[in-house]
From Swiss-Prot:
Catalytic activity of the protein: (1S,2R)-1-C-(indol-3-yl)glycerol 3-phosphate + L-serine = D-glyceraldehyde 3-phosphate + L-tryptophan + H2O
Subunit and partners: Tetramer of two alpha and two beta chains.
Protein name in UniProt: Tryptophan synthase alpha chain
PANTHER family (alphabetical): TRYPTOPHAN SYNTHASE ALPHA CHAIN, CHLOROPLASTIC (PTHR43406:SF1), TRYPTOPHAN SYNTHASE, ALPHA CHAIN (PTHR43406)
Keyword Transferase attached: no
Keyword DNA repair applies: no
Record Gene3D superfamilies: Aldolase class I
Functional description taken from the UniProt entry: The alpha subunit is responsible for the aldol cleavage of indoleglycerol phosphate to indole and glyceraldehyde 3-phosphate.
Keywords in alphabetical order: Amino-acid biosynthesis, Aromatic amino acid biosynthesis, Lyase, Tryptophan biosynthesis
Pathway: Amino-acid biosynthesis; L-tryptophan biosynthesis; L-tryptophan from chorismate: step 5/5
Length: 253
């Protein structure tokens, strides 16, 4: 079992915060201190976004964070170079669209990841049918390709998506982009229970989670939560203490 999956399997109430690399007053120089802050607060893993000019899955908060990072000339290459200098006990997960990886060179990208604490990859615009672009390069590495499973995904498709999944399953709690709050389906809890029954891989719930009541709800029917827009917004507004309290409360339900 790879590190990311082992880490999440050994815990309940997993909490994975999402941050945008380079969305800091110090640019990428601030990435290390943000990771340290999130690690010390009790995060199970940390998802790091790569800014992209056409972020189809991102809501306005994360899209704006990406634009701020791009304005600081943050790129996949500069992020990887920065991550090589960071030492953390918490597994990192890179969230990137496929085009930057393809332009960088897939084999070169994976080789660079191996020199960092990155243990997982989320590529939202890479469908299952095209995973062979990535999988052959990471199968024997301590890096997992994390699948996203939507509430509207048919059961037969869910089984395909989780069949050879590693790390964790990213269960998409709402239909649409990230940060769209209070739009949860009444069937969501049952969907998450059903999804969890298909696999031994931890299922974590994300998209739109912004309150401790959301966290409590999803901790009861999945292995934990991923919180993006709230974390990105609070960090941008200088509310580090609020972020720490939120994570501490979330993991201690």
């Amino acid at each position: 079992m790879k590190t990311l999956q082992m880490t999440l399997s050994n815990k309940k109430n997993n909490f994975i915060p999402y941050i945008m690399a380079g969305d800091h007053e110090k640019g990428l120089e601030g990435l290390k201190e943000t990771i340290q802050l999130l690690e010390q607060a009790g995060s199970s893993a940390i998802e790091i976004g790569v800014p992209f000019s056409d972020p189809v899955a991102d809501g306005p908060v994360i899209e704006q964070a990406g634009l701020r990072a791009l304005a600081r000339n943050v790129s996949l290459s500069s992020i990887l170079e920065t991550l090589k200098t960071i030492d953390t006990k918490v597994p990192l997960v890179i969230m990137t669209y496929f085009n930057p990886v393809y332009q960088f060179g897939i084999e070169k990208f994976v080789a660079a990841l191996e020199k960092t604490p990155v243990k997982g990859l989320i590529i939202p615009d890479l469908p299952k049918e095209h995973e062979d672009y990535i999988k052959p390069f990471i199968n024997d590495k301590d890096i997992c390709l994390v699948p996203l499973v939507s509430l509207t995904t048919p059961l037969s498709r869910q089984k395909e998506l989780v069949a050879d999944a590693e790390g964790f399953i990213y269960a998409v709690a709402i239909n649409g982009v990230t940060g769209k709050e209070n739009a949860y389906s009444n069937q969501l809890d049952q969907h998450l229970k059903a999804l969890s029954s298909l696999t031994d891989v931890p299922v974590l719930t994300g998209f739109g989670i912004s309150t401790l009541s959301d966290v409590d709800r999803f901790n009861k029917v999945s292995s934990g939560v991923i919180v993006g827009s709230k974390i990105v917004r609070d960090l941008h507004e200088g509310k580090e203490n609020e972020v720490i309290k939120f994570i501490e409360n979330a993991i201690n339900f």
